[in-house]
């Protein structure tokens, strides 16, 4: 049999289309002057520096230190909106612009107190000191070689002595060569080769 159509199963008519609405343009952020951007960056860096200095001092209570760390995170975030950063700066530091002006005045006064005076030795030529001249000071490490007692540069050169080849000849032609250590004559012939194996 036939199924009865209920209100639910009846297709709804399509909605009446009126005039086609144009999409509303997204509000573009107002163009910000380059000077204002630079000023904001300076203020932002100053505030981050002040908060970081306070945090690094270690004198803050735990709750205040946590809030300061959160504020630094917001200020250094690249995704946080500009308005949020300004709010955090105002809440954390109060009138930060006035504080910046005071600090700038202090630094300006300090920079005025610095004086540069020319040195009197500026006309004097510089000189180079060789290392060999410094070695005579005695501060450098030296071996314990005997040093000549007299200055050899002031003495006349001594004549070269004639070479006498007979001075190289041993005094006794029949004596065997000996080292400079003593061996008892009775033990010199007591060498035992019993432990040596001379197989070829």
UniProtKB/Swiss-Prot annotation:
Sections of the chain in a coiled coil: none
Protein name, as recorded: UPF0488 protein CG14286
Family recorded in the similarity comment: Belongs to the UPF0488 family.
Positions of region (Disordered): 1-28, 139-174
């Amino acid at each position: 049999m036939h199924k009865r159509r209920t209100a639910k199963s009846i297709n709804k008519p399509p909605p009446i289309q009126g005039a086609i609405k144009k999409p509303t343009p997204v509000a573009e952020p107002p163009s910000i002057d380059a000077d204002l951007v630079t000023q904001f960056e300076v203020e932002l860096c100053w505030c981050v520096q002040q908060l970081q200095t306070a945090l690094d001092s270690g004198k803050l209570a735990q709750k205040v230190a946590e809030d300061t760390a959160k504020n630094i995170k917001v200020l250094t975030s690249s995704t946080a909106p500009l308005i949020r950063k300004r709010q955090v700066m105002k809440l954390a530091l109060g009138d930060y612009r006035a504080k910046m002006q005071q600090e700038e005045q202090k630094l300006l006064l300090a920079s005025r107190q610095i004086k540069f005076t020319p040195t009197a030795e500026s006309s004097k030529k510089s000189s180079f000191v060789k290392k060999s001249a410094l070695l005579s000071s005695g501060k450098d490490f030296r071996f314990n070689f005997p040093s000549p007692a007299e200055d050899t540069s002031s003495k006349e050169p001594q004549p070269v002595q004639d070479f006498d080849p007979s001075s190289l000849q041993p005094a006794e032609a029949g004596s065997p060569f000996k080292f400079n250590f003593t061996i008892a004559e009775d033990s010199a012939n007591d060498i035992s080769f019993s432990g040596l194996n001379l197989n070829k």
